[in-house]
Design a protein with these regions (language model features):
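ATP-dependent helicase/translocase motor core
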Residues: 2-298, 302-306
Length: 306
């Protein structure tokens, strides 16, 4: 008889693997535990003294406001709060520049009470905030079941309490043999067609959860994807994550800019997201200190708007 790995076994193996990659396992049963851990990580990340209850409540009230898209912008901004002595303090939620210099934790089976009670499989926390949700299904089940499950979480419980689960940037769905990722957004903008397999540089799909974890969920790579390779589309209020071939193209262009004065080009087919690749490349290059100006040229007016 074939030994079919259960969902619970898959979850246990994933947690062990993530700990090997440098994630700290933390027990978080509910929102109260989540908030207590977030407060501690926020203080450590910003190297500040312990926040008073009043100060922390201020911060939580600011973080609670807005849609998924608004919270994605908040994640990337410095936030202010009034200290008990009436001076102004500032906090960062994530290091956008030295993206490896963040704190990585993992937990599982967090239960949140909203319209319905939901218990999530595996949650990756960066500086105490839940930024990646991994939904697992046992081998043999369709991957779309995991996709639909994350949509139910959004409808039923992600916005409950202080709504910190709406800070999720990426979802990972897997049945062990097929594994895909996609960006968080409002439910009306989500589509199973916009879930992607990760690949290597030769475009070989990495479908097994174990292999995907080693490559995509490596702490530095994951935070690079979140800080560098998610685009906030203001025209549609949605988050867009680059596909692997776009990621590798941008990485090579940026490398060429940093290391050489020679020209180069990237070849993409129609409908492959060339404009997004070009935009993200330009955005990253503008952050290089030695680059004074980046000229972004399009050949049609509709691309300029896009």
């Amino acid at each position: 008889m074939t030994n079919i790995q259960t969902e619970a076994q898959m979850e246990t193996e994933l947690l062990k693997q993530l700990e090997q990659l440098g994630y700290q396992y933390v027990t978080i049963a509910n929102e109260a535990d989540l908030l207590a851990n977030f407060k501690l990580q926020l203080e450590r990340h910003n190297k500040i003294a312990a926040l008073s209850d009043r100060e922390f409540d201020q911060i939580l009230n600011k973080l609670q406001k807005g849609s998924i898209f608004d919270k994605a912008k908040t994640l990337r901004q410095k936030k202010d709060y009034t200290r008990d002595d009436n001076t102004v303090g500032y906090i960062d939620l994530i290091d956008m520049f030295d993206f490896c210099q963040n704190t990585y934790q993992v937990t599982n089976q967090v239960t949140i009470d909203g319209k319905y009670q939901n218990r999530y499989d595996v949650t990756i926390l960066i500086n105490g905030l839940p930024l990646v949700q991994i939904e697992l299904k046992r081998r043999g089940l369709e991957l779309k079941e995991a996709f639909n499950q994350t949509n139910r979480y959004e409808r039923h419980s992600y916005g409950a309490g202080y709504g910190l689960f709406q800070y999720i940037q990426l979802f990972v769905i897997s049945n062990g043999v097929n594994t895909k990722y996609y960006a968080n957004s409002k439910i009306s903008a989500r589509s199973f067609e916009q879930t992607f397999y990760w690949t290597d540089t030769q475009n070989n799909q990495i479908t097994q959860l174990k292999d995907f974890t080693y490559q995509f969920l490596d702490t530095c790579h994951l935070s690079k994807m979140i800080t560098k390779y998610i685009v906030l589309n203001e025209s549609t209020d949605t988050l867009m994550v680059l596909r692997p071939y776009q990621y590798y193209a941008v990485e090579e262009i940026v490398k060429r800019v940093k290391e050489s004065d020679e020209n180069g080009y990237i070849w993409h087919t129609t409908g492959s997201g060339k404009t997004l690749t070009s935009f993200k490349t330009s955005q990253i290059i503008t952050s290089i200190p030695d680059i004074a100006k980046v000229v972004f040229v399009v050949d049609r007016k509709d691309l300029d708007y896009q």
